[in-house]
């Protein structure tokens, strides 16, 4: 079955979901919110920033964490422009065509599971967190889902299903999505990342606008870059 793989942050959702969720979490709990901006602007690499982010959830019951994700999503979805409209419309087209839809994201299940349920997604490949025997987050990562890890996970999914990569689609907005985009028959760039736009120009990949809007937004159509 043809499969459409979607990155999430700034490809389907207008927000960076991890940051939006953590800001929502800290605001609701009355906690400090300055550490997140300090982390974002630190010289650490992306993986170390992710690990520092997740360690802030150490000691949180996993069930509470997941339930908070549903509350966060409901709040986010009620905003004026929660989605990347072109990405959402593409997902709806794939769903109408009967394609399998898979989210591939460095974010976590607290954010992604409610998105997947709302949008009729078939599967989620994401950062998986360690949970101890008492059902509490340890703050450690079991499996990251950034860069090459996305391509590795997608390769495993396609091998299991027997789907040829050339029958598949992938959508991404960031240079770290390049390994994923490069492995499918129809890669689709979302937004204006300069690395991805360069590849789009060289290889004739389609480019979608990253305009944010409501679920029923009517922004337009595919362009090529």
Where is each model-derived feature located?
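Glycine-/proline-rich flexible loop or hinge segments
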Residues: 47-52, 69-74
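Helix-loop "lid/cap" segments that line or gate small-molecule binding pockets
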Residues: 25, 49-59
């Amino acid at each position: 079955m043809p499969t459409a793989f979607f990155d999430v942050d700034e490809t389907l959702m207008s927000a960076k979901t991890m940051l939006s969720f953590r800001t929502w979490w800290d605001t609701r709990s009355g906690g400090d919110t300055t550490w997140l901006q300090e982390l974002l602007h630190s010289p650490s690499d992306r993986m170390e920033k992710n690990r520092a982010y997740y360690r802030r959830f150490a000691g949180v019951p996993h069930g509470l964490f997941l339930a908070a994700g549903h509350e966060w999503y409901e709040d986010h979805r009620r905003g004026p422009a929660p989605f990347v409209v072109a990405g959402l419309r593409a997902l709806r087209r794939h769903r109408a065509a009967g394609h399998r839809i898979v989210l591939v994201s460095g974010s976590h299940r607290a954010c992604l599971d409610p998105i997947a349920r709302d949008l009729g997604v078939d599967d989620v490949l994401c950062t998986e967190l360690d949970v101890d025997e008492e059902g509490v987050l340890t703050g450690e990562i079991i499996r990251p889902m950034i860069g090459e890890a996305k391509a590795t996970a997608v390769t495993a999914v396609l091998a299991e299903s027997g789907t040829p990569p050339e029958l598949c689609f992938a959508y991404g907005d960031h240079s770290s999505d390049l390994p994923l985009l490069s492995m499918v028959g129809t890669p689709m760039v979302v937004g204006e990342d300069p690395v991805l736009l360069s590849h789009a120009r060289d290889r004739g990949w389609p480019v979608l606008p990253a305009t944010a809007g409501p679920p029923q937004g009517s922004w337009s159509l595919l362009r090529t870059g």
